[in-house]
Curated annotation (Swiss-Prot):
Heterodimer of an alpha and a beta chain. NCBIfam families: hip (TIGR00988), PRK00199.1 (NF001222). Keywords: DNA recombination, DNA-binding, Transcription, Transcription regulation, Translation regulation. This is Integration host factor subunit beta. CDD domains: IHF_B (cd13836). GO terms for cellular component: chromosome; cytosol. One of its GO terms (biological process) is regulation of DNA-templated transcription. The gene is ihfB. Coiled coil: none annotated. It comes from Haemophilus influenzae (strain PittGG).
Length: 94
């Protein structure tokens, strides 16, 4: 689902709210999550999951095209861990 599809579904579910207001709310929520991660904070949405940063150590990588070794610096990457309720909802037993 894309951000625009999410906004369309929210507009259909809440027809009394203007589409522009829904768009602004979705953008604000995503911006708040991004800012929190940028500040090094963890964001937890109970029943859904949590967003945090994982820190990658510097390492020696390889250029796949040339095969040359490349030094990769340390970096932080966003990480999402699904909550118990979300895991239970998507765990479809075949």
């Amino acid at each position: 689902m894309t951000k625009s599809e999410l906004m369309e579904k929210l507009s259909a579910k809440q027809p009394t709210l203007p589409a522009k207001e829904i768009e602004n709310m979705v953008k604000d929520i995503l911006e708040f999550i991004s800012q929190s991660l940028e500040n090094g904070d963890r964001v937890e949405v109970r029943g859904f999951g949590s967003f945090s940063l994982h820190h990658r150590q510097p390492r020696l990588g390889r250029n796949p095209k040339t095969g040359d070794s490349v030094n990769l610096s340390a970096k932080s990457v966003p990480y999402f861990k699904a909550g118990k309720e979300l895991k239970a909802r998507v765990d479809v037993q075949a």
